[in-house]
């Protein structure tokens, strides 16, 4: 460690120039500051640098090899939070279980409570404090449950979907949740998240293809919701459709996936500007591909990276910074308990995050606050 002792300063009419820089505790006294939608890479970040993420309205500081979010919460969106909630399963032993984990810190899931009835291959969305599960249950295929994300315990009945729906997908802007399905000509229904009650008809997914056979990938920002994955007859298609969440109407064409993917639940995760989609089955093969789109800009998806292994039946959610995919079914290793993650604004392959309580697939996932 260097020590500076100053007795006298002469020629103080100009600033002292430290040619090798001046650091305190390894951090430059004068830090760089960047405003951008993407994580800055040049100049190479050093300890103490600040980055204002204009896409998510989050302030970061570079510490210990990475940018860390500053403030009470890293969540900048009204529809998610730092606590992931994963519910249901295709296994009767745990098809009512809700489990949770902290998205900001890698680790394993713990028990949260139980759904009101068995469920699989439904979908979830919320408003940052409440998460609603649109269930596909053996006993009922149009029911919805809800939980308060910060309070461990069992789910309560919310109401019913406007139709009996199989293999749903849900989007949210923080006040309204819209749920769609391949059934009833691609019917969609919506609810106000902070109340309880039955869903109201929203419109239909506008496609001649079957939508989301065994689950669709959905994403959203504060205005738009996207639905991806379909079948054209018995073959995989690559369609993405979108809606304006506050405007009840049929969907419109958004673009296409980078590869055809259709059934057995590939899943999306979103922040305020970007939706990432991973897993699924296409042309008879399990996929490990991750695609991404800018949610507010129509066009085709771009390759993001790969999941840790090719999977179907995955579920996913995010905290507006980190996307997590949970469980899934591998064609040779069967159901998995793995949780894997990516940083939504940084393209690349997924990494291991932790484990679910048990191996499972065809679950539902959402997120909300932890306090």
Regions found by a protein language model. Give the residues of each.
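Surface-exposed or flexible loop/turn and strand-edge residues in extracellular/cell-surface modules
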Residues: 1, 6, 13, 19, ...
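Low-complexity, small-hydrophobic/phenylalanine-enriched stretches
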Residues: 4, 9-37, 84, 131, ...
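Extracellular/surface-exposed low-complexity repeats and stalk/linker segments enriched in Gly/Pro
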Residues: 21-54, 68-74
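A detector of repeated loop/turn-to-beta-strand junctions in beta-rich toroidal repeat architectures
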Residues: 56, 81, 94-97, 109, ...
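Short beta-strand segments and strand-loop junctions that repeat across beta-rich extracellular domains
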Residues: 57-65
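Short loop/turn segments that connect beta-strands within beta-propeller blades
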Residues: 65, 102-106, 148-152, 192-196, ...
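A short beta-strand motif characteristic of beta-propeller blades
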Residues: 109-114, 154-160, 197-206, 250-258, ...
């Amino acid at each position: 460690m260097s020590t500076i002792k100053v007795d006298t300063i002469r020629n103080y009419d100009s600033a002292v120039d430290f040619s090798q820089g001046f650091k305190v505790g390894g951090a430059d006294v004068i830090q760089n500051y960047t405003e951008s939608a993407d994580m800055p890479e040049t100049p190479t970040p050093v300890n103490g640098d600040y980055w204002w993420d204009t896409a998510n309205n989050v302030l970061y500081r570079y510490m210990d090899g990475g940018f860390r979010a500053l403030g009470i919460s890293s969540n900048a969106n009204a529809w998610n939070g730092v606590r992931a909630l994963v519910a249901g399963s295709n296994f009767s032993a745990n098809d009512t279980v809700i489990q949770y984990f902290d998205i900001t810190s890698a680790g394993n899931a713990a028990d949260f409570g139980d759904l009101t009835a068995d469920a699989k291959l439904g979908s979830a969305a919320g408003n940052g404090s409440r998460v609603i599960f649109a269930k596909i249950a053996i006993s009922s295929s149009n029911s919805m449950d809800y939980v308060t994300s910060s309070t461990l315990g069992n789910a309560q009945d919310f109401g019913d979907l406007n139709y009996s729906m199989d293999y749903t997908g849900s989007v949210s802007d923080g006040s309204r949740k819209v749920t769609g399905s391949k059934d009833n000509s691609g019917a969609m229904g919506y609810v106000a998240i902070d109340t309880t009650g039955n869903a109201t008809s929203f419109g239909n997914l506008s496609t001649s293809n079957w939508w989301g056979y065994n689950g669709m990938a959905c994403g959203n920002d504060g205005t738009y919701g996207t639905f991806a994955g379909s079948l054209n007859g018995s073959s995989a298609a690559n369609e993405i459709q979108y809606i304006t969440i506050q405007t009840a109407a049929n969907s419109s064409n958004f673009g296409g996936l980078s590869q055809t993917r259709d059934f057995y639940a590939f899943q999306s995760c979103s922040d305020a500007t970007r939706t990432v989609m991973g897993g699924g089955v296409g042309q008879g093969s399990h996929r490990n591909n991750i695609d991404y789109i800018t949610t507010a800009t129509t066009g085709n998806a771009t390759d993001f990276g790969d999941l840790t292994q090719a999977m179907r039946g995955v579920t996913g959610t995010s905290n507006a910074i980190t996307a997590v995919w949970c469980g899934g079914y591998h064609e040779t290793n069967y159901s998995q308990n793995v949780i894997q993650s990516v940083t939504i604004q940084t393209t690349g392959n997924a990494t291991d995050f932790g484990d679910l309580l048990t191996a499972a697939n065809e679950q539902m996932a959402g997120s909300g606050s932890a306090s």
